[in-house]
Amino acid sequence: MNKFLILLMVFVASLVFALPEDAKQPIEIEAQSVVVDETTGFSEFSGNAVVRQGSLLLSAELIQVQTDNEEVVSMIAKGSLEKPAKYIQSQENQARFVEATASQITYDVDKGMVFLVGTARLVQGFDSFSGDTLDYDINNDRVVVKGNKYGTERVKFKIAL
């Protein structure tokens, strides 16, 4: 178990995040329980799981981490409507944070993308975006928000001037 967590810290430390310093920081994962399958590279942290690396914070009731060839491929944080998953991180060259919440947050390492599904909300400085789904491109600081397919939940955007 400890061997896996140390290896996981090394793998995740190589990820590209909004702050270059974050990628050099060790990763810390806390949860009430963990299931690790070293043959598939899959691990599941449950019970108020929290991932920290530098300024990055990812928290949810359940966080799944997938590795391939000793590199992290993705992290999926699963919350609920009552207690959504949360993503927080500082932005490079800015004194503000990006804070996102949703029922499910998926971080795709290769693409540098954060995908939010289910009552998605992202706050960036004084601006906020919300909708059913939200895709956040970390590297290009680009946000795509969509309402639900039934048209009952529209996209909302608030900008502070």
List PLM regions with ranges.
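Mature-chain termini and adjacent capping regions
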Residues: 1-161
